[in-house]
Amino acid sequence: MKQVNVKKLILPNIPYVFIALLATKVSEAVRLAPGSDASTKLLNIMTGLNTAFHSLVPSFHPIDLCVGVAAAIAIRLVVYIKGKNAKKFRKNLEYGSARWGTAEDIKPYVDPAFENNIILTQTERLTMNSRPKDPKTARNKNVLIVGGSGSGKTRFWLKPNLLQCTSKTYPTSFVVTDPKGDIVVSCGHALQKNGYQIKILNSLNFKKSMHYNPFAYIHSEKDILKLVTTLIANTKGEGKAGDDFWVKAETLLYTALIGYIHYEAPVEEQNFSTLIEFINAMEVREDDEDFKNPVDLMFDELKKRKPDHFAVRQYGKFKLSAGKTAKSILISCGARLAPFDIQELRELTAYDELQLDTLGDRKTALFIIMSDTDDTFNFLISMCYTQLFNLLCEKADDVYGGRLPVHVRCLIDEAANIGQIPRLEKLVATIRSREISCCLVLQAQSQLKALYKDSADTIIGNMDCSIFLGGKEPGTLKELAAALGKETIDSYNTGESRGREVSHSLNYQKLGKELMSVDELAVLDGGKCILQLRGVRPFLSNKYDLTKHPLYRYTADYDKKYAFDIERFLSHRLKLKPDDAVEVYQADLFGEPVA
């Protein structure tokens, strides 16, 4: 049985009780007024009122009570009918309430100290504090930047945010995708000056890169599966859906071989060079199903020692394939790993210097230099990002209780060109709590949709900030115009009719208009940008002026003497510093002569 809310039933009707009591006094006044007819009583009504209101006690005369109840019911009925037929007016908001944001709108989201903020525009910033005093102003630090070629994505947004490296309250590490290698040259000195460790992964020129070995971050069987998934996802080329069988077969073989390398090979051999050697040694004879190549013999020996070994189980599934099928699988694997036939790439991945799992421990700037015209080696960059996210999330959970001590910001320029980061739609939704943020820089939103398909909307939805720097891609403009909404404007029409007499007419009306239409967005001023922050009105603001940043004077853009010399840095990075920790081993090179 539904419980009656007594409080809700009584409180709204209290005013009508007072009306009823007042009506009893008025009825009493009319009844006590001298006179035998209505006109006489009306003339003497004041006498009746004085008599009736001499006492504030309500009249309980039957006639007066009936009049009071009738008056209360009548007024309640009028109020009910009025409310039922009431029209809802929103003056000047009839067709929409869209407007541009103001300084008061952004104020709750800004930290008073300039260095403790993410730079969004010239006038808008967002605090780096993930847990502000007022929880309703908490926003994740994921940012989507969209701008056509030449709109200033690097100069007006990426570089200013990279120079936000002086905060002691919210220390930050950076992972920067550097398409042409000019960002590290421009800002490397400023970062070093503020205590940052510089690390460089260069797929454009392997000789100007530190070493990166994905095998160095394998610690368990699930890490092997993650590495294989990333490798497959970013070296698939233009494969069709019909290739699914071969992909699964390759996955089995990669998993088995990498598992063997990780658990059985010496540390110095745990790299892609060893994987290539394994595949090259896997000879298959279609006319001899019982033939065993050297890799078969190695797995047979391992199976005798450890029959339940992870690699043995995976290899056993692969060996279910017939000779001709196995040969096709090996050819497919060889084609996929063809880039590792390049000696420089094998040397690059021979061992690891990047220490990706330490970016959340201390202030570090990792620059990932890549080609913006050739994506041959971009799978290596995507693999690096995938391992980076996984390693940092695991370390945050297992070591630091869920939050890294140093926030890690990934500034991914040319995000559509680095390849697909597996499960990015899930990562952007969960990395916030671990003090990790992801900033995607695109030329058009269609790039993201082409790469991530249906997951693109999920990725965009988890970006609390989005900035439009200008562009002409129709899909992006249409979506932005719809997101900005409509405002209500005043319109008037004038008319003139001529005949025997000339008459004029003037008509005023309200209309709805997009805050900015598609054609207006297409011709947006080159110095302007549009910022959208979740829960706040959009802002039409100036792009940030890099020359106004306090650290601009330490960049190569200001003075070429501050250019960061990559070759010199890489040639000197192995020199010991006074505070470096080293291990010393004593070796006896001159033992006692053998008798």
Feature map (PLM): residue ranges:
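P-loop NTPase motor domains
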Residues: L9, L21-E28, K133-I436, L451, ...
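Conserved ATP-driven motor cores of ASCE-family P-loop NTPases powering translocation/secretion/packaging/pilus
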Residues: V428-I530
